[in-house]
Amino acid sequence: MMTLKKIADVILPTRWADFNLLAFQCADEDKHAEGEPAETVLALTLGNIHLAPPLVRIHSQCMTGEVFHSMRCDCYEQLHLALRTIAEQGAGVLVYEHQEGRGIGLIEKLRAYQLQDQGLDTIEANLRLGHPVDLRNYSLSVEVLRFLNLRSLQLMTNNPEKIDAVRSAGIEIVRRVSADVPANPHSAKYLATKRNRLGHLVSSTPGFPNAGNYFARRASPPDLGDDAVNTRPATLHLLQTPSRKR
């Protein structure tokens, strides 16, 4: 049985808004009996999340993208997109899970990167290392949403598994909000693999002259149209990025 406990609640000023940062500890009785430590998960909340179905993003930790700004993935841009959009709407939740590398951990993720440098895609690399394609489990995120007493929400995601996890918990998704961000020459293959082999709902993204500048400036609010959950994926648009000085 899973028990969720809030252990901290602080104000977190950001460039977009002052969020409340909640820290949770989850004790799974089965894992506790085996001596495993309690899992932790974070949630950033903003505004009154019960006046209307709030915008919610379930986001997995990515040290390479979010700390070192790696261009191999879209994690950094998706995190900023979610926080900025929540701030623009005035209310919302971002659940931040510690599931680095789709659940295989940082070191194994870097080993997978080595194989990708040799030509394998993200799926082939995981399988070569003996890992599942995606080891993540969203039960902890769902428990956070239940703790926050959310019965309906707008879910920002391109991942059908997150949609299924939320719906299976009996939480209504009134709208899927696209988590598309501009591709770059380093992330194009990765995003195409997510679309074509993992079934992610990656649709076309508008072109910008400089991907690096897109999230460094105050861009216009994204079109949050009434995206259907079964939105068909479309073509990715590559961006030219300036060469780095060495």
What are the residue ranges of the model-derived segments?
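Catalytic domains of riboflavin
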Residues: M1-L224, N230-R246
